[in-house]
């Protein structure tokens, strides 16, 4: 048995245990997935994330957690047609610092391929750790444009048969279809199959499309600023300032900090053989939190809550160790990570550990190696 006092002293960074739950060291990246309701689209059910027959909504959320949490540009999540959205959260408050941007939203935009998403933020006013407080849109370049529709509402209907085009109707009296694109995406349905309801209604702002073209040639130019998946990730246009927040009447609102981010697809547009415009997200970063440097001779220690789900990204040969509060090693594993290509960039696979065999308790985690990241299943 390892002496607990010696064990604690052997680490350079230790997180703090508070009350009935445990808090990790602050991550600069989102650490929680609360909601995911994509509108219908050509990638829905097929990928980003893929749907397996019979999967529940919670299982879909777990797939998102495995690819989105704890790092940037980890995996792509598709939000589908206009209104489809995701709600994410940080393990800390993102500070609104004066005269600088505060957040970066990662997507997969490149030259003339913008698929803009509207970004909203919320502060945990009631302190319950849930995104149930008011939301504020970060007003981008086109928020006050006459062509932008505020208070837009659109409903999508489950197709019958399931592989049919998806009908939509809006509050302006217009209607249309999310068209099948079977040459490239021939899954059973474009309507999210884990959603039990036969219709999905979304509300928000709708931008006028900038896309143009026809036949085999289409372009979708970026908006000036203030939208997700609009500019490449290395462009300042992927950055956001909390000072852009406005209320439902379009009046500026000052937020000293935020905890939650909601993003939804901002346009309703079909681009021929390219299919519908659908915002895609691969991560969100707090630009004011430094990424911890584990170093080659250092270790990372965090607490594992009673959820007992763990996500690890580390090079092959790194070792994960789990200790109980008496200092006894209760689980260890050598990381045998492979790699995947994401937009031409080689990335480490995120390994998921389900430690359900451990009694519900508090555990200490250590990841040793040249570098790495740990993300627990606290949701």
Regions found by a protein language model. Give the residues of each.
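Residue-level detector of flexible, active-site-proximal loop/helix-junction positions
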Residues: 18, 126, 142, 337
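Predominantly extracellular/luminal cell-surface or secreted proteins
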Residues: 120-124, 323-325
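Short, threonine-centered small-residue motifs that mark membrane-proximal processing/anchoring sites
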Residues: 288-294
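C-terminal outer-membrane/trafficking sorting elements
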Residues: 294-379
